Amino acid sequence: MKQLIHNDWWEVLKPQFESAYYAQLHNFLKEEYTHQTIYPEMHHIFEAFEWTPFSKVKVVILGQDPYHGPNQAHGCSFSVLPGVPVPPSLQNIYKELQSDLGCTPVNHGYLKKWADQGVLLLNSVLTVRAGQAYSHRGHGWEQLTDAAIHALSERPKPVVFILWGRAARNKKQLINTKTNIVLESAHPSPLSANRGFFGSRPFSKTNEALQAMGEQPIDWQLPAEPNYR
């Protein structure tokens, strides 16, 4: 079969791509991309995996499904393409980053610098219809992304999992909490950020955990201009 991810994730996830449920998902997506407006564009679907190879993952920030507005989604949780206004949840992430570590907020939402350092920006569902949040839930993506979470959890090198909001926190059951670090809080959405996201200090806690593992901490400060490289 055609190789869909061009790094070590391919071998990790190949059994999923060869499964019956993925064949059904593939057929569903062919129909959807033919007859509907679907985000992200097809070539961006697996961008989170492309940007952060399995062996390089230090941190996972788990999202739900892609942004469903024009030109926003590009396959990575919370990140948006350059030239698009920073969405409200990401604005709140920047506020927490500033109060936690003193990072200066930037006026773009392109999180590639994080991904390049080992932060896997993973949504549990990888596609969505334009303007219809959660419209591709229950078609198979969850099985594939659950398999990715479980594979990381069982890897000898531990991972810091950042779970914001109920949907992400429900994934905790997939994670071996004896060997990995799990940081949980409310979602950064304006609807819930004041109920435990603000003040949760996930970025400094992540770096403390990484340093305790003997890993390099993440430089969370994003560049003023988006880095396309």
From Swiss-Prot:
Q: Which UniProt keywords apply?
A: Cytoplasm, DNA damage, DNA repair, Hydrolase
Subcellular localization, as worded in the UniProt entry: Cytoplasm
Which residues does UniProt mark as catalytic?
65
Broad class of enzyme this protein falls into = hydrolase
Please name the InterPro entries in this protein's record.
UDG_fam1, Ura-DNA_Glyclase_AS, Uracil-DNA_glycosylase-like, Uracil-DNA_glycosylase-like_sf
* Gene Ontology terms: biological process: base-excision repair, AP site formation via deaminated base removal
Q: List the disulfide bonds.
A: none
Question: One Gene Ontology cellular component annotation?
Answer: cytoplasm
The organism's place on the tree of life at top rank? Bacteria
Q: Name one GO molecular function term.
A: uracil DNA N-glycosylase activity
Q: Which reaction does it catalyse?
A: Hydrolyzes single-stranded DNA or mismatched double-stranded DNA and polynucleotides, releasing free uracil
Mainly resides where? cytoplasm
Gene3D superfamilies in alphabetical order: Uracil-DNA glycosylase-like domain (3.40.470.10)
Homology family? Belongs to the uracil-DNA glycosylase (UDG) superfamily. UNG family.
Task: Please identify the protein, giving its name as recorded.
Answer: Uracil-DNA glycosylase
Natural source organism: Limosilactobacillus reuteri (strain DSM 20016) (Lactobacillus reuteri)
Q: Tell me the gene name.
A: ung
